[in-house]
Amino acid sequence: MLEGPILAVSRQTSLTSGIPGATKRYSFAKIKEPIEVPGLLDLQRDSFAWLIGAPEWRAKKQAESEEGARITSGLEDILEELSPIEDYSGNMSLTLSEPRFDDVKNTIDEAKDKDINYSAPLYVTAEFTNAMSGEIKSQTVFIGDFPMMTDKGTFIINGTERVIVSQLVRSPGVYFDESIDKSTERPLHSVKVIPSRGAWLEFDIDKRDTVGVRIDRKRRQPVTVLLKALGLSTQDITDRFGFSELMMSTLEHDGVANTDEALLEIYRKQRPGESPTRDSAQALLDNSFFNPKRYDLAKVGRYKVNRKLGLGGGSTTGEHTLTEEDILTTIEYLVRLHAGERTMESPDGTELMIATDDIDHFGNRRLRTVGELVQNQVRVGLSRMERVVRERMTTQDAESITPTSLINVRPVSAAIREFFGTSQLSQFMDQNNSLSGLTHKRRLSALGPGGLSRERAGLDVRDVHASHYGRMCPIETPEGPNIGLIGSLASYARVNPFGFIETPYRRVENGQATDVVDYLTADEEDRHIVAQANTKMDSEGRFVEDTVEVRMKGGNVEVVPASEVDYMDVSPRQMVSVATAMIPFLEHDDANRALMGANMQRQAVPLLRNEAPFVGTGMELRAAHDAGDVVIARRSGVVETVCADFITTLGDDGQRDTFLLRKFERTNQGTCYNQKPLVEAGDRIEEGQALADGPGTENGEMALGRNLLVAFMPWEGHNYEDAIILNQRIVEEDVLTSIHIEEHEIDARDTKLGPEEITRDIPNASEDILADLDERGIVRIGADVRDGDILVGKVTPKGETELTPEERLLRAIFGEKAREVRDTSMKVPHGETGKVIGVRVFSREDDDDLAPGVNQMVRVYVAQKRKIQDGDKLSGRHGNKGVVGKILPAEDMPFLPDGTPVDVILNTHGVPRRMNIGQVLELHLGMLAKSGWKVDPESQDPAIKAMLETLPEDLYDVPADSRVATPVFDGTTNEELSGLMRSSRPNRDGDQMVNEFGKSTLIDGRTGEPFQQPISVGYMYMLKLHHLVDEKIHARSTGPYSMITQQPLGGKAQFGGQRFGEMEVWAMQAYGAAYTLQELLTIKSDDVVGRVKVYEAIVKGDNIPDPGIPESFKVLLKELQSLCLNVEVLSADGTPVDLGADDDDLDQANASLGINLSRDERFDADAV
C-alpha cells in the first residue's frame, strides 16, 4: 500500500562530495573530514516516515535493532495507547489497530492546480467486542484523508506548499533549581516534575526550612502530607528521611495523623469549596499522577527521570506514570541538594552526582519534529472521538452495534485539518530561492503551542548556550522580536529517537584520532573532553603537541594533556548552519554582520542568468542538491532525449527514467521557478549527477547572485551611507535582472440578482480596451498589460430600477440582453505591468471542483522582467547591504589600467566600524580566482615561503576563471592570500591588474586622470534582494476613504495616501505655512463637503472655496456626546453652527458632477 509517490522521500540516495559532473572547485581546506554532511532534509523526512511507518523506515529500523524487537510507527503507538475504548460498564470494547494508507488521490501538480490537499486515504482495522455475548465484529474503517509529505519535505495544503517547523520545547523530566532569598540571602532549592501530559508536581524548601509540595500549581502544603496520602506511615517516612532535620521538622508540624486525613487535606487544597470524601480524594490523587490516561511522562520523560535520579539503571523502560519511588527519590535528592551534599547513593546502589539543572541546556530541551507534532494532533482528535464512541455504546442497541456505527471520524480529520491549516508551526513555505526553502525546513522554533511566547521569553532563553555547539547555529536567527527564539539546525546535527539533537565527534584513543564517529547528545558531551577539528595532527592522526586546547563542560576552554582527550570535532563547520556555512571568510566577520549575511542569502531573488560564486565555501553543491530544486540522475546510464520540458535517460540496468522539468512557475513569493537542462542527448551520466538546474543554481551548485568587479572608494558622495553605485552595463546586459510572476484570480458566482458572467461584452468599454481579450473575455497569452488593463471581463447583475419608457421598449425588442449589469472585471492592479504567460480556466461545466456558489474561476499569470534600478537593495554575503543610489554610464565609471570599468563602487566607510573584513578578503581572492595564479615553489620571496607552509599542493597552479572554496574556519589564511597575490597570472598584455596588496591604480572615467591612492579592486559575489523599489513605490490621486473618519486610507495595498503626521505639522507651523496647513487638515483630508466643492471649482475654473468642517471634528463631538457631555459649536458671533447643513449641498454637487468622492474602505483599490 505504501509504494509509489507517497514516500519518494525515502528513495533519495545520500550524496557524497564526489558528485559526478560538478564544477571543479579548488579548495583551501586543510582538514580531512571523516564523514559527509548528513542528508539536509532528513530532519523532516525521517520524522514523517516514522509517523506513517514507511516500508523503508521499517527496514532501516529492523537492521539497527535486535532480532525479534517490535517496531511500531507513530500512528500505531497512538492507536495502542487509545485502545481498547470501553463503555462505562466494561462489557463492550472497541480496539483500533493496523493503520494503512491507499495510494495518494492526486499528483502534486493536480493538488496545486485545484487548491486541494496532497493526501492519501487512511484506514484502520476496528474490532468491536461484546463481552456479554462473546461476539467480535471486525471492520476496516476510513479515518480521513491524511496529508502526505512530498519528496522535498513539504506538504500541499489547499493548493499551497507549506512546511511544518520543528519545535524546541522543554523536555519532560525532573528539574532542580536554586534561587536566592532576597531577605536572608540564603539559597533556596526547588524541584519540578514536568510530564509530557498531566499535572505538574513541585517540591520546594522555603526560608523557614520546611519542605513543601504544590500539586498542579495549587496551594502549598507540607510534603509529608503527600507522602502520608501515598500510604506511607510516620515510621516509613522517618526510616527514609531520618537523616534530614528539615523533613523531620516538616513531619512534626504537618497536622495530619494518617493516610485518610492526608487525602482529605490534599482534596481541600486542590478543590476548595467542595466537600471531600475519602474515595473522591483517593481518585483525585490517582488520576493526577498514576492514571496513564491522565498523566504521561512519555518515553523521553521516563528516560530523563531515570537518568537524573539513578533509577532503573538509567534505562528508558518503565512506567510512563509516576511511581512512589520516583517521588521519594526526588524529595531525597532535593533535601540533600539543600544540605550542600555533592553525591548520594541512588536506589540502584550507584553513586549519583547532585547538581541543579540548567533549563536552557540542550540536554533539557528537545525537538518536536513534524511526525510528533502531527501525532499529537491525531491523539487530540482520537480522544475527542473516544468520548463519542463511549456515548454511542450506551445509547445504541448492543446487538446491532458495528464498528462503523460507533466511530465518528470528523473530530480526527478536523484536528488534522486545523493543525495543517492554522497552526503557528505550519508555515507558508519560503520559496524565494533554493536556500530559503532548505533553511525553512531545518528551522527550529521555540514558539508555538506548548512553547514560549515572544513577550514572556527573557534574555537567557534567547542567548547562545555552550550546548548549542554543533546542534543549533549560533549565527542564523531573525533580527526582530524573535531573535534567539528561532534558530537553524547545525550542518552535521541529527535528531535522536527521544527528540534530543546529537552532533558527531571523532573518537580519540591515546592521543590518536580514529575514523570512528559517535553522535553525542548535549548531556553525553558534558561528560567528555572534546578537542577542536583544527588541532594539529600528523599523517596518522596523532596530536603533534603534548597539550591540546579542549572544550570542557559548560563550554570552558582549557589546555589538557593530549592523552586525556576523548573526542574531537569532525569538521570546523559543524557548529554553523547551511546558510552560515556558505559565507566565505566567516571567521573574519563580526557575528552581527554574519547573521545579516546568512539571513540575506535567503532573500536573494533568482536571476535571469545564474552564476556560482568565484569564492565559495564548498557547501554550495551539497545545499543545492539536497534542496531538491536540481534534477538528479537516479542511476548511471545515457541521456536519450532532452527538451525544455523533460529529460529521458536509459540506465545501465535497462530502466528508463523520465524527468519532467518545471517551467516558469510562480513560487509562494512571486519569484520564477524554472528548470533548465544541463545535459545533451547521448551524454554519459552517473548516479547522483545533476541533469537540470533549478532557480538560483548553476551546474548543480547554489548560485544566488553574480560575480561583479567591485572597487572600494567614495565617489562624489553618491555612495554615502551604504548607497551603491552601479555600472549601466549591469542594467543593459541584464546582469541583475530577475523574473517575477503574479497570479490574479477571479470567480463568477451566483448572486441574489442572478449569476455573474465572464464575458467580452462589458458595458461602456471601447474596442481598444477589449483588444487583447478573446471571445470568452479572457486576456490572450502573450499580451503586454499595464495597470488598469482588463485581464478578465466580468459583469454582475445590478438591482432592478424603475424602467423608463425607452428602456421598456428596448427590453421588449431585445429581451433580457439589455438588463442592467455593472462592470466588475479583473484589472491589472495599480503600478503593475508585465506579459501574460498563462491562463487557467476552471468551470463547473467541466466538472472542476469549485467552492459552493462559484460557477467559473479564472487564474491569469503575469510575468514581469525587472531590471536593477535606483532604490533596489543589493547585498554581499557578509551583511554588507545597501541601496542602489546611482547608475552611472560605463564611460564614467573608474576603470582598471587595461580599460575594464568596474561594475560596483562600494563606500570604504562600510567596512571598519562594522568589522566585516571578510568582504575585503573575498574581494582579493575573487580577483585571484578570476586571474588565476601559478606559484613558484623555489621562490625565495618570504611571503611565498610563508604561504607554501600551509598551501595544498594542488593549488600551486590554478587557471584563470576558476572557482575556489574557502570553507568556514578552515579557509585561506592571510599568509596564503599575501603569497598568491604575488603569484597571480598577468593578463594577455602581460600586466598584473592588482599589486601585492590587492590594490590597483584606478583611472577616473570622467577625466582620464588616475585617482591619487591605489584602490582595492576585485570580484565580489553580489545578491539582488527581494526588497525591490517597484513593489514599494506608490502615489495616490483620489482613492478610498475610511468610513468613520473619512480620511484617506494608508498603505499601498489600500491605494492609500501619505500620512501627514504630527511632526510634519510641526514643520509647517515652524515655517508659518498657514494656508498649506489648512488645506492639509481639511480639503485634502476629511472635509467631505469641501473636497467635493474644490473638485467642482477646479472643473468649472472657479477660485478654491473656503474649507468646511473636518469629519474628524464631528467624530470628536460625537465621542464627547457619547460621554454625556453636551458640546455645541458656536460661530464667532456666538450663534450655534449646524454641522449637518452642508450635506444637502454635497449631494447636489455630487449629482451635478457625476462623481462620488466619499468612498469607504469597502471599495476595492483596483476599482479606483
Curated annotation (Swiss-Prot):
Top-level lineage group: Bacteria
Give the E.C. number(s): 2.7.7.6
**Gene3D superfamilies with a match to the protein in the record:** 2.40.50.100, 2.40.50.150, 3.90.1100.10, DNA-directed RNA polymerase, beta subunit, external 1 domain, DNA-directed RNA polymerase, subunit 2, domain 6, RNA polymerase alpha subunit dimerisation domain, RNA polymerase Rpb2, domain 2
- Offer an example of a GO molecular function term for this protein: DNA-directed RNA polymerase activity
- Keywords for the protein's UniProt record, in alphabetical order: DNA-directed RNA polymerase, Nucleotidyltransferase, Transcription, Transferase
Xref: InterPro entries: DNA-dir_RNA_pol_bsu_ext_1_sf, DNA-dir_RNA_pol_bsu_external_1, DNA-dir_RNA_pol_su2, DNA-dir_RNAP_su2_dom, DNA-dir_RNAP_su2_hyb_sf, RNA_pol_bsu_bac, RNA_pol_bsu_CS, RNA_pol_bsu_protrusion
Question: What does the entry list under GO cellular component?
Answer: DNA-directed RNA polymerase complex
SUPFAM superfamilies to which the protein is assigned, alphabetical: beta and beta-prime subunits of DNA dependent RNA-polymerase (SSF64484)
Q: Which reaction does it catalyse?
A: RNA(n) + a ribonucleoside 5'-triphosphate = RNA(n+1) + diphosphate
Name the enzyme's class: transferase
- Coiled-coil segments on the chain, per record: none
Q: NCBIfam families attached here? A: PRK00405.1, rpoB
Family assignment?
Answer: Belongs to the RNA polymerase beta chain family.
Q: What is the purpose of this protein?
A: DNA-dependent RNA polymerase catalyzes the transcription of DNA into RNA using the four ribonucleoside triphosphates as substrates.
- Subunit arrangement? The RNAP catalytic core consists of 2 alpha, 1 beta, 1 beta' and 1 omega subunit. When a sigma factor is associated with the core the holoenzyme is formed, which can initiate transcription.
Protein's name according to its UniProt entry: DNA-directed RNA polymerase subunit beta
What organism, scientifically named, is this protein from?
Answer: Corynebacterium kroppenstedtii (strain DSM 44385 / JCM 11950 / CIP 105744 / CCUG 35717)
- Write the lineage as a comma-separated list: Bacteria, Bacillati, Actinomycetota, Actinomycetes, Mycobacteriales
Q: Report the gene name.
A: rpoB
